[in-house]
Amino acid sequence: MLLERLHKRLHAGSSRRSQENKDKNCKPEDALPIQPEAQHQTQDPQPLLNCDYDDMIAFDRNLSTPVFTPVMTPINNSSSNQAKSSDASYFPPYLNANRTRQNSASSLASSVSDFAQNFKQHTFYNNNAQFTSFTPQFVGLLLEVYQNTCSDPTITPFDTTNPPSGILNRVAKAAIQQSELQQLDIGCDRNSWLLTLVRQRLLQEVRKDGYLSRNTSLTSLPPPPPPQFSEMLRVPSPFVNADITDPIPLSNTNSNPNVSSTTSLTNTLNWYSLQRSNVSMKNRNGSSQYISELQPQPILARTNSNNSVSNSNAFSLLTPTPTTDSAFNFNIALLSRQRSNIISSPLASTRLPTANVSTEESSILPNESLKLKRDLLRLKR
C-alpha cells in the first residue's frame, strides 16, 4: 500500500513538472519575431533634376535621399544653328541675324536719313576740330563746284537740297583737286579723313542754303503787325502812318522829291528789309544768286486821264516810272494797290472831279491828286 501511494505521488509530481516545462517551452504561432530597428545614414542634399514632384515614381522609405526618375528628358539647344532671340523680340529667327544692318543709319538712303554715315562717324565729325576749320575760300570753291555739278545736263536729276552720296563724293574729289591746282589753303591737313570731312561739310552747307532760301522767300515773310503793336515796338508800319506821303512819284522823272518824303520812304520800305539777310538764294534750276540788295524795278504810277465814255475808274492809265531807291521792296506795290482800291470806291468816285484836263494843266494835276488821296486816306481811317 505504501508503495502504491509513493508511486502515485512521484507520478503526479513528474506529470506536473512536465506540464510546466511544456508550458514554458511552447511558443505561439501568430507571434512575430522582434527585429532590430534599421539604422539610417544621413547624407547631404543632392540637386534634383528638371521634373515635378507629381511626376515622380514611389521610392523606398528606408532611404533618406530618394532617387527621382524624371518623366521628361531636358533638351539642350546650345548646339542648334538658329540664332538666339530675346523673349521680347517678335522677329523671326532668320531676320534677327540681319537686324544690326537694318537698324543702322547707313542702310537708309540719303534722301531719308539726316546722317550719311553711322553714329560713330557722326560723333567723330562733331568732336573733330578740323571739321569746322575749312577756310572761306575753300568753302566758296566747294559750293561753286557743286553748282556746276547741279547744272550739268549729263547728270541724272536729283534733289539739290539733299544730294545723294555719289554726288557728294564727286564734288568733294573735284574740289580737292582744284584746290591743289590753284594752291588754295584748305585749312586742315590732307589726310585720309579729308574726303569724308569735305563731304560732310558740303552736305551741311547745302542743307543750310536750302533752309535759308525757304525762310527768306517773299511768301514766307510774316504778315505786317497791327498798328498798336508797331507803335509799342516803335517800328514804322508801311500801311499806317499819320503823315503819310505818296512814295510813288506821280510827276515827271525830272522832278526831285522832298527830303522828308525820301526819309519816310526809306523807313517804310526798310520795314521788311531789316528782317532779311544777305544769303544765297537758289532757284529750281539749281543756280544760286547772291543777293546783297534788291535791284530797283519800275513802278506803275497811277495818273488821272480824260475818259468821256467810261467814268467808273478815273485812274486807269498806268505809266512806268523808274525809281532810284536801292532798298526797293514789294510794299510799294501793296501801297499802290490799296490806294487804287480806295480811289475806285463809290465814295471816291463821287468826290473826284471829272472835268476835262488840258495839256497845260497836266503839270498841276499830280499835286491835286496827292491832296485828294490824302483826304481819302484820312476819311478811310
UniProtKB/Swiss-Prot annotation:
KO phenotype (gene knockout): Accelerates the G1/S phase transition.
Compositionally biased residues, Basic residues: 1-11
GO BP annotation list: G1/S transition of mitotic cell cycle
Compartment(s) where it occurs, according to its Swiss-Prot or TrEMBL record: Cytoplasm; Nucleus
GO cellular component: cytoplasm; nucleus
GO MF annotations in UniProt: cyclin-dependent protein serine/threonine kinase inhibitor activity
UniProt signal peptide: none
Record region (Disordered): 1-30
Assigned keywords, A-Z: Cell cycle, Cytoplasm, Nucleus, Phosphoprotein
Quaternary state and interactors: Interact with the CDC28/CLN2 complex.
Function (record text): Acts as an inhibitor of the CDC28/CLN2 cyclin-dependent kinase complex. Stabilizes the CDC28 inhibitor SIC1. Negatively regulates the G1/S phase transition. Contributes to osmostress-induced transitory G1 delay.
Name this protein carries in UniProt: Cyclin-dependent kinase inhibitor CIP1
Species per Swiss-Prot/TrEMBL record: Saccharomyces cerevisiae (strain ATCC 204508 / S288c)
Upper lineage: Eukaryota, Fungi, Dikarya, Ascomycota, Saccharomycotina
Gene transcribed to yield this protein: CIP1
